[in-house]
Amino acid sequence: PNLTEYLKEQGLGVGLISTDSLSSQTIAAFSSHTSNEENTEEIILEQTRSGVDLFLGSGRDLYRRYKDNFISESYSYYDKFENIDINQEKIIGVFDEEKDETTSKTIPTLDKLTKLAVDFMENNFPNGYFLVVECGHIDKMSHNVNILDMVQYLENFDKAIAGTYESLKDDPTCAIIVASNHETGRLVYNGETK
């Protein structure tokens, strides 16, 4: 079993959220067993049977084809953030792909996704849960060596973590771990700027 399957076997809740598509590498690694990140259909079909309690991210147009698969596995399926009812057993929320500021198509900000996810997990899993929060666009902007946009996404990630810390800081059983899976774009701080 993968980590999330093991945690489900232990009776814990599992939530996976990202600003990127839910079929992207990080989320797929926690919710499928495919050996190729380009096996999108296989990833999504495995996600429907994964037992993950909460999926939030982008990919609405892609996931629409699999809506019935998720519903048949007891997921409440949402494609509008404002319609999500956290009083459900399992949720998948898939939103518009991330776009530039010239379009109206954007997924909810990471801090909003994270707050909803924490509320859902806290309400439904009193014995504990595992929540992955990914800002996939930090990596994308770094690949493009777009430092300004990368910093904006990093600030939103920081806001999401700060909000989570504030809501959970009095819980002695909670651990918040912040990690990077790799560096891209050769971003280097030289220590000279203020």
Could you tell me what each predicted segment is?
Residues P1, E5-K8, L12-Q25:
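Mobile, glycine-rich extracellular loop/lid and propeptide segments
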Residues S23-K194:
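A post-motif C-terminal structural segment
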